[in-house]
Amino acid sequence: MQKILLIGLLAASSAFAKEPLKKETTSLQTVTAEMATAANAFLASLDAAQAKKANFSFDGDQRENWGFVPRERKGISIEELSERQISLVRDFLKTALSDTGLEKVDAIRTLEAFLAEIERKPDFRNPKAYFTSVFGEPSATGTWSWRFEGHHLALNYTIIDGKAVAATPSFFAANPGEVTQEHKLKGFRPFHAEEDFARTLATSLKAAGREVVFSETPPGEILTAEDRTVKQLDLVGIKASEMTEAQQKSLMDLVAVYAKRHRKELADADIAKVEADMANLRFGWAGGLKRGEPYYYRIQGTTFLVEVANIQNNGNHFHGVWRDSANDFGRDLLGEHVSEDHGK
């Protein structure tokens, strides 16, 4: 029922409610080739004025100018595109996201439409104010980048030599976290797994006498905010190596909820990287453990970070981000790329 309502609310952009992503097992090089093909198809559909808005230099400042709050943005918005062009954006997103990831993108835009309706602020809350940007010249063997972004959503992908993809920063959020108003969307809670898996794990750890709760008072927001670069945050909570096997599995199940927003090839690579860093992995919670109480949690490793805050609106406004302090925007991979070029 909620999925039907979700699609119905986005009828104004019907191309954003098409068939799910086909399940295919391909190499990472095929993923990057598909991204390049989709990017070039989208760019080819634009007129000169649209292309000027959508295509930027790879080396310019705009590539890392990301954010998740309502604001003016560069790129070209859904509102400025034809139905065919919107369909091409959808195809573009399919090269990176799983069916679940696509559903969450739709859910975020659905909630934006819901807020526009109940707040009566259609200019401020606009489900068509989501922008596509391409940085550099997409090719199957090249280095380039792309972003899809709007309020409560920021997807960033950097492709290096057509061989590797960096998929952070990756931000998904929902306001409200759960629709409680008398409305056809009542009960809609698109990030229930991200909340419930974490709360269940934290509750079990606390019940076992583990110091997973590092503060009774949560911070007001995710600490990394919209920073372009992030450093290792203070080590809080408990180490995964100090958990039982069942608790470690629960922690990795939670990590997988975030990773599997992306298509299998990207998700598997992210999960493998986190598993390889299990000795340094930590999980910490701040705030209340009862549903409806404001809370904050983070999972962190050597460079990996998932940070979540559900503080605003009395704990009914979900913010969650996946960061990599070494490789956001592909920095680490780009460093290797430069070193290899200099070695030739």
What are these regions (language model features)?
Residues 18-98, 102-344:
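A cross-kingdom marker for long, charged
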Residues 8-17:
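Hydrophobic h-region of N-terminal signal peptides that target proteins for export
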Residues 1-7:
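Sec-dependent signal peptide recognition
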